[in-house]
């Protein structure tokens, strides 16, 4: 970090969002937990965090899914944890993404899409993420990235403004990092001054700067120089570094 940083006095702040306290909707074919207010779940304390607006932890039954529907002016990312998801959109894309795959769609001026579980037997477990773009009216775009072979014990930059280091390019000053950890793995992530982090545990268990978190838990962190993560069981974590 820059030498001048050492002269700044930081008052660390961490706000924990426990998984069991999230909004919950069980529609039979869809079992969904909402980190932030979404659809019929509304909590004024949890309307989003910085540009991060939605993290939905969804399980979709075999053969079921979200039919063709519209979006505009939103950055939409989907990460598949188990199973598979079939994507179709009005841009002409038709893909099946599987466990370990990330999908990005810039809704921009407007796009229609559907997301369906193509399996006749297996539920699909996924995270759907919405980030508010820094400008409206961009051209719709689709991209995907496979992380199935990603090295464990490392944070991988998977999305960023401008698409740094081969990551998917999004329309916001937000970096999304993905980590796959084995028990005992330790990771550190420097957090620049005036930036804040949202850490979401997708699977497993870990300790973040002294706080124990398990699957579905999350934490908002600011005013720290370094985020320290230690896996206490095999885990997957998403780290959002936000302006």
Segments the model singles out, each with a brief description of its role:
Residues 2-243:
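Jelly-roll (double-stranded beta-helix
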């Amino acid at each position: 970090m820059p030498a001048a940083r050492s002269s700044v006095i930081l008052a660390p702040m961490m706000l924990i969002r426990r998984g069991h306290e999230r909004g919950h909707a069980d529609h039979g074919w869809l079992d969904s937990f909402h980190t932030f207010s979404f659809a019929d779940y509304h909590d004024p304390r949890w309307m989003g965090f910085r540009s991060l607006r939605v993290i939905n932890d969804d399980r979709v039954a075999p053969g079921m899914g979200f039919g063709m529907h519209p979006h505009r002016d939103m950055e939409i990312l989907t990460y598949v944890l188990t199973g598979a998801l079939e994507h179709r959109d009005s841009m002409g894309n038709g893909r099946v993404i599987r466990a370990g795959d990330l999908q990005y769609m810039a809704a921009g001026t407007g796009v229609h899409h559907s997301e369906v579980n193509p399996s006749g037997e297996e539920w699909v477990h996924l995270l759907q993420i919405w980030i508010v773009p820094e400008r409206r009216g961009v051209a719709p775009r689709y991209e995907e990235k496979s992380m199935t072979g990603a090295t464990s014990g490392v944070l991988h930059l998977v999305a960023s403004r401008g698409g740094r280091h081969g990551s998917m390019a999004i329309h916001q000053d937000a970096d999304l990092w993905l980590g796959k950890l084995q028990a005992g793995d330790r990771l550190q992530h420097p957090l620049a001054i005036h930036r804040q982090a949202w850490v979401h545990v997708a699977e497993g268990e870990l300790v973040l700067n002294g706080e124990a978190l398990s699957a579905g838990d999350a934490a908002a962190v600011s005013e720290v120089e370094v985020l320290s993560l230690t896996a206490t069981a095999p885990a997957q974590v998403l780290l959002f570094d936000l302006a």
